[in-house]
Amino acid sequence: MDAATPDCTSKCRSLKHALDVLSVVTKGSESQIKSFLARYCYNAATVKDAFGRNAGHLASSCGKKGVLDWLIEKGVDLLVKDKESGWTALHRSVFYGHIDCVWSLLKHGVSLYMQDKEGLSPLDLLMKDRPTHVVFKDTDPTEVYTWGDNTNFTLGHGSQNSKHHPELLDLFSRSGVYVKQVVLCKFHSVFLSQKGQVYTCGHGRGGRLGHGDEQTCLVPRLVEGLSGHNCSQVAAAKDHTVVLTDDGCVYTFGLNMFHQLGIIPPPASCNVPRQIQAKYLKGRTIIGVAAGRFHTVLWTREAVYTLGLNGGQLGHLLDPNGEKCVTTPRQVSALHHKDIAVSLVAASDGATVCVTTRGDIYLLADYQCKKMATKQLNLKKVLVSGGCMEYKVDPEHLTENGGQKICVLAMDGAGRVFCWRSISSSLKQCRWAYPRQVSISDIALNRNEILFVTQDGEGFKGKWFEDKRKNSEKKADILPNLHHSSSDVSCVPDTNSVYERIRLEKLPFAHRAVSVSTDPSGCNFAILQSDPKTSLYEIPVVSSSSFFEEFGKLLRETDEMDSFHDVTFQVGNRHFPAHKYILAVRSDFFQKLFLSDGSSLELTDVYQKDEDAAGCHLFVVEKVHPDLFEYLLQFMYTDTCDLLTHGFKPRMIVKRKAEDCEGSPDSHLHTVNCHVDDKQKSAFEVYRSNQAHTLSERQKSKPKSSKKGKGVGDDDPVRMLQSVAKKFGLSNLSSRLEGVRLENEKINVIAKKTGNKLKLSQKKCSFLYDVTMKSVDGKEFSCHKCVLCARLEYFHSMLSRSWIEASSCAALEMPIQSEILKVILDYLYTDEAVVIKESQNVDFVCSVLVVADQLLITRLKEICEVALTENLTLKNAAMLLEFAALYNAGQLKLSCLQFIGLNMAALLEARSLDVLSEDVLKDLSIFYRKMIPAMERRVITPYQDGPDISSMQVEDGEVFFKEEINMEPNYSETMFKKAKTRAKKKPRKRSDSSGGYTLSDVIQSPPSAGLLKSAKTNSVESLPELLTSDSEGSYAGVASPRDLQSPDFTAGFHSDKVEGKAKPYVNGIPPPCTREDVKPWEKSPTTKSAPQFIPSNRVDTAASSSWLAGSCSPVSPPVVDLRTIMETEENRQKYGAAPKSNLGKIISHGIKLSQKQRKMIALTTKENNSGTNSMEAILTAPSKSPKPANAWAPLHSPLSRSFRDFLLEEKKPVPGYGSGDHVKKVCFKGTENSPALNVARCSTHGTPGLESNHVSDFPLLDSPNPWQSSSLAASPAVAPVTFASIVEEERQQEAALIRSREKPLALIQVEEHAIQDLLVFYEAFGNPEEFVVVERAPQGPLAVPMWNKHGC
């Protein structure tokens, strides 16, 4: 375990190694497993245990896809089988339900058809694991799959291309047509739907398609002549078609060359369906039809009728008069017996087979009726092929000794198949030469082979083993194929055997088959498979509508000062702001009112007065109580009101005499509220309650008579509201109030009536349009603001007063296509999405769902989920699952997961899961294991013995480090794009005191190679880490990323991270007090929360001091007077031309100095270069300082010292430093305006007490506002330059030279890409007003390059 290399060779076959490897695979994590395998055994990928299992078998069984992929890269043999059951890794991953591992194996070429010792392939295991409720029946909705050579367009795919495996006939699936029977012929095909409709395609010569013409149809087309009949069975041959309806009528069409249509007089052809006259059937009901090339067969329970060319297959003798054809249906006399009841009939070109209910099988051929077998009870299907006809009957179409041998197949209810062949003349049971047992549910027969469908939905193709005596040369080929056959199948066929031996071959892409058919020649095939959604029960559900609740909320939240209402009603002393569109749609009265502006109405109780506080129309409504008008509005908005609610207790409204109505607007109405405390009553309600007491005493004298008479509704609020509803044209409300009574001061709904619900239309009331939506493609939609705001919070926020869209007169541009925007608006108005429900375009519905998800229209999103589930197919299931996972469509995702789980075999065989991401594949695996109940018991218990890997970490294996550093060539570019995208999603924000910075600050400041770094941090960031860092506070510069170091600003600002040491300053600035620094009884001078610092990967001193100072300062900079500003400007001009200090030296980009050095140099440069543009920083003095000192005072150069002095200086501490003081070394880099970057080496003392007492106020550097400036801080003492800093500088210059030589091409390309993006962003090309140049910053000093001579 601890050895660096394994103790074996590449040919290791150690059984102990194998056991240890398998033990670790079962109990370790993926990282531990890979680390162990890389160190433990050279042959860990292929070593096997005693059962033949390797690491790949166990990894796929445990679902550890990462280990499996790693083993595949190491060359593990994926096709190796274990010794116990012959399972491959694919068998095991399927058995344990790890679909992600299955897909990984399939991508590396593992076959799905490899069989184990029991003859089961991985597809068979999937079929065996199918849930028990999934059963395929012929009554299920079925889809048609066809394949073959397609010579005559008989497959219906719209082209003449051949199909090598079953393909869906999507015409029926798109139109929702389910087919229950398919008949394939040489020149055409007939399809019978479950609804009784007939479709045909192929060559139409002679009218065999029944469309009224002889045109060729490439795809199935409905036979219009039979659309009014419910057809139950179809039969067809080479030139004609026979159709049987539910009522026993028979229709035929096509060529009538042999009088097989049964039409009198016989035409040459018939291109539309025509009925066979019932008089020839003696009033009996036809229950079945069959057809051959030369004849047609009809049968009832009692008799069989044939017609057509009599070549011996009709069951009739030769006509003595020489008539070759039977024109009308004629009963077969040999089967005319009282004990014969016909159950099944089949026909071929030269033979007819009949089966009776007693189990007798009759063959009509050679002008005879032969009994082939007896007592074959419970037969479900019979088929016949071949046959020979008398060529003298029609020498033009028949040849002497023509035809094929007769073969008859019969299947009983138990799934047994019996075969009768003319070469053996005996009925034999078929036995299958297949490694496992199959149960047959349907059969089809052609001249060369048999097709089968099993009860499990599988499809097979079978062929007979040829006779040994005639095909002895093929014996060598036959014997290997029977090697894995069941024990009851002998390898050598014998004509005297009681079984007919059939060799089976599985059909691909047949997993839900219920029926199969073939043409007589065996060139084209069709198979009916159950609809893949048949067993799906996870169907999305649309939540209940909140349409009325949203409008009710709009009514409740509307006030006179909002920007949404456009009309106000004054009723009594109350004002009701409302929306014209809703009132106009609900009432013709209000529509006329708004059209006429209240000037030409006959009703004088409503008139326009003036404008309300928001400038909207104000209407006065008289002789209506405010409560009644409130109920009225409530009904118009929500389609209901309180007086329609059973059990509601309304307030009693009493009307006084008419002469009392001339006073105030409310003087004629009094209300008694017996259900509210006096403290909750308004003054008006108390007044009405006092007046009601007197009225109640007057009515005590005749309480009974008060309930009768003319004024019965005067004190009933229900009747009063009904009267008001009629007055305002709300007949719907009036009719619904008919079934409402007020009993015992409560509402009693006697008869609940439902009227026309609230229906809104975008096209109604066009004169009230107040907002216009404009789509991306330029189409405009006029809408009503109140509907948009009520239905969607997005529009409510957009159209509020605080946004420009609310006051803009221009159309609102929506980033949505017009088709999608129309669906959104229709939903907002009608609460329905008819277009979505009827749409077959999955992409369009997905686009609507995306927009609905963005706009948070949950119910429309659910409608889209339902529509997508209805259109779920095997082709789009994986795509929709990935789509649902991406847009958080939970119900759609669940439906897709179950759909894929139910059809896992078909989707894996079709390779349809390649669009799924790894996360979705993992979710699919989890769901699949939960869906199969047996998966709970299929768990591999981790092996207890074996090596202990509990202490093993990821770093233990060298292979991981190599994998991580070996990036793809385009990886850096990909990460740069991701970082750019993330930066767009997170825009920078800046406030006066947040300390942030804008994009212009980043672009104008020069890129720096050095980083502020704590003493603890020595890590180097890779290029992907730099490019994917947060966009706030960091950006990718142009220098090499190898010299970038991980920043850690928290070390200088959080005392809990640096224990026992004083906090290091950044740029000589004391850090702010954190919450731990402030005592509980002292009031902090800062705000409640300390500012958060933004980490940066590339910060120069000028820029960093600016934003760091801003981030540290919780208050705004002080405002100084004009004199101070003038003095400051004078000092700048005075010292601007001063010579630079001797300490100024050029420093290269990328030099790595310690944090102390950088701080020290930066502070010194502030003092020396104050007149230049390289640094202008003003520090506020501590509160204890009596007056500010001049920060621009000239700095005295340090005295010259010897080498010994430098050594002694480093050994002894600097005088004047306390125990908590530190020497700060700062590396400063100038701005882009300076021609060269300076280096200053100095040592500074921190000011004692600054950190513990208060937080200094730091202004933003180089503020454009001259009125905002800060006081000047005193300059700290200068520290001597150490020898170590000189050595460090030389080392960094050498490192800079190496970096410049080894700069990777990928980084250079990133820089060039960034330069081009900046040029485009600042519109540098063709700009006559500005000259914009973007170039790399100078690298700075490098070490002198040395070229060594080699080979001397």
UniProtKB/Swiss-Prot annotation:
Listed PROSITE patterns: ANK_REP_REGION (PS50297), ANK_REPEAT (PS50088), BTB (PS50097), RCC1_3 (PS50012)
GO biological process: release of sequestered calcium ion into cytosol
Membrane topology label: Peripheral membrane protein
Basic residues bias: start-end ranges: 701-710, 977-989
Gene3D superfamilies membership: 6.10.250.3030, Ankyrin repeat-containing domain, Potassium Channel Kv1.1, Chain A, Regulator of chromosome condensation 1/beta-lactamase-inhibitor protein II
InterPro entries for the chain: Ankyrin_rpt, Ankyrin_rpt-contain_sf, BTB/POZ_dom, RCC1/BLIP-II, Reg_chr_condens, Signaling_Regulatory_Domain, SKP1/BTB/POZ_sf
Extent of the RCC1 repeats: 141-194, 195-246, 248-301
Location within or outside the cell: Cytoplasm; Membrane
Domain of life per record: Eukaryota
Domain BTB: residue ranges: 565-645, 769-837
Protein name from the UniProt record: Inhibitor of Bruton tyrosine kinase
Native species: Mus musculus (Mouse)
Gene of this entry: Ibtk
